[in-house]
Design a protein with these regions (language model features):
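Transmembrane beta-barrel wall of Gram-negative outer-membrane proteins
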Residues: 304-405
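Periplasmic polypeptide-binding modules associated with outer-membrane biogenesis and secretion
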Residues: 54-268, 280, 298-307, 466
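Repeated loop/turn-to-beta-strand initiation elements of outer-membrane beta-barrel proteins
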Residues: 233, 258-260, 287-293, 319-325, ...
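Residues that define the transmembrane beta-barrel architecture of outer-membrane proteins
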Residues: 245, 273-277, 305-309, 347-351, ...
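Outer-membrane beta-barrel "beta-signal"
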Residues: 281, 558, 584-596
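C-terminal outer-membrane beta-barrel translocator/porin domains of Gram-negative envelope proteins
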Residues: 379-523, 528-531, 535-537, 581
């Protein structure tokens, strides 16, 4: 009853207000909790997506092997081929035939006099007739000795020299043989001269100075003329009507003002390609200095993925074949496929100056040396941030030697020494953001190639080739040895595996056919096996220090006309999956090009 009597309206209102204040406070706290939870979820989602977008070490390695532009120059480098060629030589089955009456002229040989030789001495000649001295011989044997002297000159390369038996009266057993040492007396030039005549005059003087004329001198200077940009030369030798032993040489020049090419292939990758379109153009002696100026461009069907442009200038600087060569290239790339999400973008600029000299130049043997300096700057961005920057300054010394041997094999051996220097604003060893964190910009490495093309039968050939590299330090990405692509590891993408050291070889059996049809000139069937292995001085992102791959395949090369050519081949990876494909399925590659 007291509880009821104590009820007052004012107390009820106060209790209601306290309840309302409590609910409002609880709602405010609840809203704050929801807001904090929302922000936490948003942050977690952002961090999750960010961590998802971070490129893995394996993905970064693949980028620098196959998609970054610092490997494009190696990818599009043309293979070096031997200049030597098999020269058909007809066996000399025709022995000189002398009249039978010569055998009837007999006499006692007391002394033999050989006149006119400036090359050989008495001792070298005496071995040819020593056995006949103080014996009775006939006139035919004297002519045989003269022929042996001629053969001695010819075998030593004096192609215009010969020995003759002059008319004489043999008295007291003394016989005379005259040697006529042949030489070039006049050099005439037919056709348009598109460069400095002084250069051709230097070649002319060198040929006139070769007395007696050696085949090596004649070959060397004719080939050096033929090596001039856009020039092809034919030569005609005619005996002089006025001088004994003299020969006149006529050079017939044919000139081509420009060379061009256009081609398409599928040798790209999923990241840059796979369809590649290339075009090139070069002008010959445009400034009348026997210089060559050229441009080349390569793009993919999606031009953002790969753009590669290069140019060069080549200039003869001596009459002995020395040439100065300037070249530059620019490439950039925004790889697609699985690398697109990582916004990879790269750029590379290269400048090279090279001096080359042919120490030996002939149809069957060539020795070339060169010295060069290369300036290469590359940078790669990932997710819009600078991931790597290399600036390399490299000096190269190299030599290549090719020759034909007696077993009808054409051989090529090359050796190259490369040395990096920390000069001219290069990125020094130990700098941040290098393509390989422990890579050396002041590296030293040696590399080389060997090739042999062996004729097995008139239409069968066996090709064997080897490429290698050894480095004394850990290298940056552009200087690594790569396996994969059109030369070695043909079933794999370009630079499928790379390393500081490497070795690769291939064997290819070839069979040639010549249909000689109007629109199908010739073709070649071939089958091959190749293998390559690389080693790294430090473990890679996968923890390994070495990788290897092998493949085999078969294909056909063809010349539709003198202008259009191409190939198609089926290649099978053997021991390792193609990284961009994720399998070891067979692959088909093709190329079609036109040269004009």
């Amino acid at each position: 009853m007291r509880v009821i009597l104590n009820f007052r309206p004012q107390n009820a209102v106060k209790r209601w207000e306290r309840c309302m204040n409590l609910d409002w406070a609880d709602n405010q706290s609840y809203s704050e909790i929801l807001l904090i939870g929302f922000l936490v979820c948003l942050w977690w989602s952002f961090m999750t997506s960010l961590s998802y977008a971070q490129i893995t070490p394996q993905g970064r390695d693949q980028t620098y092997k196959q998609a970054a532009p610092d490997r494009f120059e190696e990818r599009f480098k043309k293979q070096e081929f031997p200049k030597s060629q098999l020269v058909p030589v007809k066996p000399d089955n025709l022995k000189p035939v002398f009249p039978a009456e010569m055998r009837k002229v007999n006499f006692l040989l007391q002394r033999m006099v050989i006149k006119g030789s400036t090359i050989y001495g008495k001792r070298q000649f005496s071995r040819l007739f020593r056995e006949y001295l103080h014996k009775r011989i006939n006139l035919e044997q004297v002519y045989i000795i003269a022929q042996e002297i001629t053969n001695m000159y010819r075998n030593d390369g004096y192609i215009l020299s010969k020995a003759v038996v002059p008319p004489q009266k043999i008295e007291e057993g003394v016989v005379q043989i005259d040697v006529i040492e042949g030489f070039i007396d006049r050099v005439a030039i037919q056709g348009q001269v598109r460069g400095p005549r002084q250069l051709l005059n230097e070649y002319r003087k060198a040929l006139l100075k070769s007395r007696p004329l050696k085949a090596l001198d004649l070959e060397r200077y004719l080939l050096l003329v033929d090596d001039l940009p856009g020039v092809s030369v034919k030569s005609v030798l005619t005996p002089s009507k006025f001088k004994q032993g003299a020969t006149n040489l006529t050079l017939i020049l044919d000139n081509k003002s420009y060379d061009g090419s256009f081609g398409v292939d599928n040798r790209g990758t999923k990241f840059n390609g796979p369809i590649q379109i290339n075009a090139g153009m070069s002008g010959n002696a445009l400034f009348k200095n026997y210089e060559r100026i050229g441009l080349q461009g390569v793009v993919t069907s999606n031009t953002d993925e790969l753009r590669f442009f290069s140019g060069f200038y080549e200039q003869p600087v001596s009459s002995e074949g020395t040439k100065l060569f300037f070249s530059g290239s620019f490439s950039d790339s925004e790889p697609g496929s699985t690398l697109k999400d990582f916004e990879v973008a790269g750029e590379s600029k290269t400048f090279t100056i090279r001096l080359t000299h042919p120490f030996i130049r002939s149809r069957s043997e060539n020795l070339n040396g060169f010295v060069s300096y290369t300036n290469r700057d590359t940078e790669t961005l990932i997710l819009g941030e600078l991931d790597s920057e290399d600036r390399l300054r490299i000096v190269n010394l190299g030599v290549s030697y090719d020759f034909v041997d007696k077993y009808k094999g054409i051989n090529l051996v090359s050796f190259n020494l490369s040395k990096g220097f920390d000069i001219f604003d290069s990125t020094e060893t130990g700098s941040e953001q290098l393509t390989r964190s422990s890579g050396h910009s002041d590296f030293t490495k040696v590399s080389g190639e060997a090739l042999r093309l062996q004729q097995l039968a008139p239409s069968w050939m066996l090709l064997g080739a080897l490429s290698w590299q050894y480095s004394f330090e850990k290298l940056l990405a552009s200087e690594e040895f790569g396996v994969g692509g059109a030369q070695y590891g043909r079933a794999y993408d370009s630079s499928e595996i790379t390393g500081d050291q490497g070795l690769a070889f291939k064997l290819e059996l070839q069979k040639a056919f010549q249909p000689n049809k109007k629109y199908f000139k010739d073709l070649q069937l071939y089958t091959f096996f190749d293998y390559g292995k690389v080693w790294n001085r430090l473990p890679t992102s996968t923890g390994s220090t070495g990788e290897n791959l092998s493949s085999l395949g078969l294909g056909i090369r063809f010349n539709v006309t003198d202008v259009i050519s191409g190939y198609m081949e089926w290649d099978k990876p053997l021991n390792q999956e193609v990284s961009s494909e994720g399998n070891k399925d067979g692959r088909v590659f093709f190329s079609l090009s036109a040269r004009f």
